[in-house]
From Swiss-Prot:
Keywords of the record: 4Fe-4S, Iron, Iron-sulfur, Metal-binding, Methyltransferase, rRNA processing, S-adenosyl-L-methionine, Transferase
Source organism of the structure: Haemophilus influenzae (strain ATCC 51907 / DSM 11121 / KW20 / Rd)
Location of the active site: 348 (nucleophile)
Annotated family: Belongs to the class I-like SAM-binding methyltransferase superfamily. RNA M5U methyltransferase family. RlmC subfamily.
Reaction(s) catalysed (UniProt annotation): uridine(747) in 23S rRNA + S-adenosyl-L-methionine = 5-methyluridine(747) in 23S rRNA + S-adenosyl-L-homocysteine + H(+)
Domain of life assignment: Bacteria
Protein role: Catalyzes the formation of 5-methyl-uridine at position 747 (m5U747) in 23S rRNA.
Enzyme class, broadest EC rank: transferase
UniProt protein name: 23S rRNA (uracil(747)-C(5))-methyltransferase RlmC
Length: 392
């Protein structure tokens, strides 16, 4: 069990399963997963042993609510979002890398120097709402974002920035996110960059990826790298030359699979990636260029748009990595119609995935594996490889 004083003192209970042994956590998650898939026939599927995570220091990202005063800022959580007195400082949270604590200390000093008054949601006063810190495990570089109510403190921030960079030379990306609403909303629409670099370079399994502000990226790098590597291994067994990556984000799944397939079969691989975020598409396209993948087309579209495009060359493999709501009945039925040989489904919500698999009536599961992306909680990631059923 992790030695966490915040949990022991009942200050933070985000890790609801902290007192449950790691082996039991995995057993319960595996049982839960099988219950969600009980309505589909997985008897012939290969159940791969769960991919385990480190139990502490595994997070590459910290989301810190800023409270307290400008002279004594508190970085952590508010147990009651409307009560600044309920603030808990989580700078020594054991889920973060140990060196984050020293970084937070430097940032507290910066808050005072730049006059960034912590926002008080009850009084609707103040400027600084959150500090968001992300680290690349490949480069050890950092992305730092200040979520502010207004631009009023921007001149002071710019004035103090050189001193901050002296103390934290690994800062690669620094930005201001403006969130003017008087509500406990994490971030707003506008991002102001204070550095030339706007993406944080990362690398999993030799695949360059780019973390962007306001974009989704897994917070457990070790398990995320394992998830992508597993996807690579599973699909490389088959002669796949045309794949779609729906909900592709910055291209993690599609790029891993395309690279592995090209190396295995020695032929150009056609990859089409669909993602609603234009900045994610820019990042994915940049990664593909670095890898030298030529037959790649990343498009900023809603994943549902593929249903309307009937003229696309039919894929051999479709990768889906949807948000918690799943892919839904309409997209499931579309996949039944176009019948790719394989579907690779990655999910953070086994319940909605189970419903989707019921709709994918033309497919049977070949392989299933749980990934312990979120230790100390009931949450997990799951990867399923589906094969088109043979018609008798």
């Amino acid at each position: 069990m992790i030695d966490c004083r915040y949990y022991q003192q009942n200050e933070c209970r985000s890790c609801q399963w902290l007192e449950i042994p790691c082996s039991q956590q995995l057993t319960e998650k595996q049982y839960h997963l099988k219950q969600q898939l009980i309505s589909i026939n997985y008897d012939e599927a290969q159940w791969v042993a769960p991919f385990q995570s480190n139990q502490q220091g595994f997070r590459n990202k910290a989301k810190m609510v800023v409270s307290g005063s400008v002279e004594r800022p508190i970085l952590g959580i508010l147990k009651n979002p409307n009560d600044p007195q309920s603030a808990i400082d989580l700078c020594d949270c054991p889920l973060y890398p140990t060196h984050f604590s020293a970084i937070f200390s430097i940032l507290k000093d910066f808050i005072g120097r730049a006059g960034l008054v912590p926002y008080n949601i009850a009084k609707q006063k103040g400027e600084l709402k959150y500090i968001l810190l992300t680290e690349s495990i490949a480069t050890e570089k950092l992305m730092l974002r200040f979520v502010l109510r207004t631009e009023n403190k921007l001149p002071l921030i710019r004035r103090e920035l050189p001193k901050l960079l002296e103390k934290l030379p690994h800062l690669e990306v620094i930005s201001i996110n403006l969130q003017p609403q008087h509500a406990a909303i994490l971030e707003g629409e506008q991002e102001i960059f204070l550095t030339e670099q706007q993406f944080l370079p990362e690398n999993f399994n030799g695949i360059p990826l780019f973390i962007r502000p306001r974009g989704f990226f897994q917070t457990n790098p070790k398990v995320a790298a394992g998830l992508y590597a597993t996807a690579q291994q599973w699909v490389a067994e088959f002669p796949i030359y045309n794949l779609w990556d729906l909900f592709c984000g910055v291209g993690g799944f599609g790029l891993h699979c395309a690279k592995a397939l090209q190396e295995k079969w020695g032929k150009p691989i056609k990859l089409t990636g669909i993602e609603i975020s234009s900045s994610a598409i820019l990042a994915a396209s940049h990664s593909a260029k670095i890898l030298g993948l030529e037959h790649v087309n990343f498009q900023s579209l809603d994943a549902a748009s593929v249903i309307e495009n009937k003229n696309e060359n039919k894929p051999d493999l479709v990768i889906v990595n949807p948000p918690r709501r799943g892919i839904g009945k309409e997209l499931s039925e579309f996949l039944n119609q176009i019948q790719p040989h394989f579907i690779l489904y990655s999910s953070c919500n086994a319940m909605t995935m189970g419903k989707d698999l019921q709709h994918l009536t033309c497919y049977k599961p070949l392989k299933i594996q749980l990934f312990d992306m979120f230790p100390q909680t009931s949450h997990y990631e799951v990867l399923v490889l589906l094969e088109r059923k043979k018609i008798n």
